[in-house]
């Protein structure tokens, strides 16, 4: 079993962590994130190091411990560096463009799809067929990218659709005639 929960989280310069009744606030150069952690996990902040402790070694406690540590580490990385998810579009006439904070996608439907940026999320469109989702909250960045991908999932015959950058789409052969 992984022992990720026992690892110490080292805070980069400019990142400040406060804990009040297991509601942890992480402030950094890119913004501020707040999250409530389970009451069974004890969070200790000592200078530039944060450690999490569990009350016992039951399987349930180990899973909660590792998840809480990973969530807190993602908050620290988010406010210091941020997260980004890149998507690419394949298909004839598939294109993306920004209208203010709104992302407008033409993906072979009779109407364009419009995606509003959730709070703390920004979109970039470096080329007409590339989309970059940026933000400080890893979960929201991933959910937003997954929603955009879900608007036109890559199909296995021609590979048309929206995919993550570097994603491998398994291809199938079409029907063969008689």
From Swiss-Prot:
Q: Where in the sequence is the signal peptide annotated?
A: none
Q: Name one GO molecular function term.
A: structural constituent of ribosome
Q: Name one GO biological process term.
A: cytoplasmic translation
What this protein is reported to do is described as: This protein binds to the 23S rRNA, and is important in its secondary structure. It is located near the subunit interface in the base of the L7/L12 stalk, and near the tRNA binding site of the peptidyltransferase center.
Q: Which family would the database say this protein is a member of?
A: Belongs to the universal ribosomal protein uL6 family.
Which keywords appear in this protein's UniProt record, sorted alphabetically? Ribonucleoprotein, Ribosomal protein, RNA-binding, rRNA-binding
Question: The organism sits in which domain of life?
Answer: Bacteria
Organism of derivation: Streptococcus mutans serotype c (strain ATCC 700610 / UA159)
User: What is the protein name for this chain?
Assistant: Large ribosomal subunit protein uL6
- Gene Ontology CC, one term: cytosolic large ribosomal subunit
Keyword Ubl conjugation (UniProt): no
Listed under subunit, the entry gives: Part of the 50S ribosomal subunit.
Family annotation (Pfam families): Ribosomal_L6
Q: Which PANTHER family match?
A: 60S/50S RIBOSOMAL PROTEIN L6/L9, LARGE RIBOSOMAL SUBUNIT PROTEIN UL6M
Question: In this entry, which stretches build a coiled coil?
Answer: none
Q: What is the lineage of its organism?
A: Bacteria, Bacillati, Bacillota, Bacilli, Lactobacillales
Q: Does the keyword Transferase apply?
A: no
């Amino acid at each position: 079993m992984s022992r990720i929960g026992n690892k110490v989280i080292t805070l980069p310069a400019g990142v400040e962590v406060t804990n009040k009744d297991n509601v942890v606030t992480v402030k950094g150069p890119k913004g501020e994130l707040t999250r409530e952690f389970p009451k069974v996990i004890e969070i200790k902040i000592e200078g530039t190091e944060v450690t999490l402790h569990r009350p016992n070694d039951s399987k349930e406690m180990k899973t909660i411990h590792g998840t809480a540590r990973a969530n807190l580490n993602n908050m620290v990385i988010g406010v210091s560096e941020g997260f980004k998810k890149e998507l690419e579009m394949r298909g004839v006439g598939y294109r993306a463009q920004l209208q203010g904070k709104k992302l407008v996608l033409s993906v072979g439907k009779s109407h364009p799809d419009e995606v509003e940026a959730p709070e703390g999320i920004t979109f970039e469109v470096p080329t007409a067929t590339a989309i970059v989702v940026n933000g400080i909250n890893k979960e929201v960045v991933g959910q937003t990218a997954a929603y955009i991908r879900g608007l036109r999932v890559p199909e296995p015959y021609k590979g048309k659709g929206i995919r993550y950058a570097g994603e491998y789409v398994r291809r199938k052969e079409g029907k063969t005639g008689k």
